[in-house]
Amino acid sequence: MNNIKLIAVLIFVVGCSSESPQSKFESLLDSEWSKIVNDNPVYASSMGDLSQNTEWSDTSVENIYSDHQHQLDVLSQLDELDISDFSDDNKVNYLLFKQQYENSIESHAYKTFLIPFSHRGGIQLQHETTSIVPFRNKQHYLDWIERISKIDVLVDAAIEKGKIGIAEEIVPPRFLMQKVYKQIELQAFVKPKDSPFYRTFLEMDRSINKIETEEIQKKALNVIKSKVIPAYVKLHRFFKDEYLPACRTPIGIKEIKNGKEYYEFLARKFTTTNLTPKEIHEIGLAEVARIRDEMNAIINEVKWDGTFKSFLDDLRTNPKFYYETSEELFESYLATSKRIDPELVKLFKVLPSMPYGLKPIPMESAPDTTTAYYQRPAADGSRAGYYYVNLYRPEVRPKYEIEVLSVHEAMPGHHLQIALAMELDLPNFRKYGGITAFVEGWGLYSERLGYDLGLYKDPYSRFGQLTYDMWRAIRLVVDTGMHYFDWSRQDAINYFLDNSAKTKQDVMNEVDRYINWPGQALAYKIGQLKILELRAKAESELGDNFDIKDFHHEVLKRGALPLDILEEYINQWIEEESN
């Protein structure tokens, strides 16, 4: 009997020790993905995993440091693997997975996790989580009530980080936090029935009968009154007494400790290149000049009798370019999307099976946020992708931007690219993750595809497309200007207004977004320029054999990639097609 046990142990040990490096890597991918899902209950709920549907993530400082140590351990495991026998696909997976951990580890050193507040999202807008978690039956509503009963844990963790940030002088600009302060007031000083957290209980799923609905609503009101509102009152007091007075006046991230080095890192991370902030700034200036020339050509075409500035002023103020109501604006977005969708077969071999819809941006965040954004579908197919549009003040949302915005956020932009990636046979970290330079570069590249889709038929719509291209070129200039050089917020606003037809409301919200999220805005134009460069090369070298459907398929069929790896794949495809 003992001999049999010994043989079994030996077989087990030999079996374990003979596991190939590739198998170890694939096991590591699986275990790390499981950890990501387990550590992020809201994300898990959004993906269709409801095993922790009553929980929040542990956002404490202690857990952040624990995660950091875990990432160091994972990186050590990756360094020990011999990848020489990996498949070509797994060599790419290894590179991307390792880069992800290296970036996270490098970012940790700058301690910006001690800035837990953003006017664009976060603890004070936690009710917006309802847009990504399910509410299809009674239990889902009860789960949400239990989840929000623990909101004080999130608030306490945010306050803890804020206090340490004050002590270490890692704090955000005060004027942005004044926006957060006002958003907190909307949570702290309301009657329970007027709380943003109660809104989801006003129109409940039809499968729930009237008696159950009333019971759930009563429970929700009790929790909002006893747990949610007191937590926000506490946060409001912290902001008023401690945080706002300690926030910094300068806007650039260079003002924190080692801030210039941090911004250089962010430039590399978001663009997936080794471009320096100075080089990116120069690229931006060149793009602004190029697009300005194209804009002037349209101004001449419409026989405008005035200056560039006066033309922009007319676009911003002439009532003919704006809808009077939010309802009219939303209907125009819907109609535009319906016109685009049937035309996509002209440019793409494969379209995603998951549909998308349109929704207004929630009223609490609309005044302080940008024109639109996209939300990916649920992994289990229970929720479509959504294109969110800003209906706040329709008098500053021009008609000539609707087409270009729609192709960027929905089809053939973000929804097409992201929903397709979710259907690919890729590791989960690639299927559900994203590389900003690729994702946003594709979105911006898609704006030019509007011409092929029958859009931009009048000069003003074409000027709208150029306005959006200019917008992303300006980002390269003002983001680097504010965070790396010595630009003020007003410098950035003035440069924006001088070179684009974006309205002042949009411009201020955009500039504030860049201040809040340094480096991210660099990805769009850098990514677009690379895709355009690769398309031009393919068209030149393949000549009559170039097929736009094939090119798009090659760009999209592996999901989001760093720009250098995308270039390798496209060059390989060009060579194969040439032969």
Positions of the model-derived regions?
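N-terminal maturation segment of proteins
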Residues: S17-N579
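Hydrophobic h-region of N-terminal signal peptides that target proteins for export
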Residues: L10-S18
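Sec-dependent signal peptide recognition
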Residues: N2-V9
